[in-house]
Structures are given as C-alpha cells and as structure tokens.
C-alpha cells in the first residue's frame, strides 16, 4: 500500500478491508492519514461499515479484491488468509458499488494448486467458482 502511494500520484487514499491490526500499527506515520483500515470482523455490522465508508471513501474508487481475505474454507489462496466468508465480502463489494463511483476493479489472490494434481484441480475449480461469483456481482 505504501509503495502505491509513493509511486502513483493519482492515488490519494487506500482503504484496506480485513487488514491485520499488527500491519496497520506498523505503518509509518507519514501514511496514517492516507491509509484507512477496516477490521474484518466489523464487516457484518452494517452501521459500522456505513460510518466507515462515509468517513474514508470520498473520491472515485479503484477496487482491488484480494481473495486472501477469505477463509480457507471458502477458497485456498497463495498467501496468509483471513476469516471472511464470501457472502460478507460480496456484501461489502455491493455496498461500494451501490454508493461509490467505481472506476476500475481487479481480482487477485489465486489458488496455488497444480492442475496436474487432483487436489489442485479441485482448488482451481473452487477458485473459478469464487471468481465467477464475484464477476457476476460486478456485472450487475
């Protein structure tokens, strides 16, 4: 996040959904007013999200959906994973799409499975289902 703020003058602020508290606390002071973090557990509380959104999202949004935020029971990715359920992630994305000017989207956090292994194929199929579900939401 800090690198993006340093290298891209068009990015004014980054909102991290589901960032670990230790990561947020370790941010250098110069970024504290340009990086806002939303706790993963608070996602299910609509009023808390609404207050956070109004306070921290005031410009057009480029949305990066990192599937690493999802619980491993939802999808296995190539990084440390969070605990969020897909339904909760989709709820937050829907609120952003509904209330903000979204100028672009990308999805990252692909599975690590190998297509040559049975377990890897299952992980890829699960990953494809998650991608399809997210893309369907974005198309609506």
Predicted regions and their residues:
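Conserved alpha-helical scaffold segments that buttress catalytic/binding sites
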Residues: 1-140
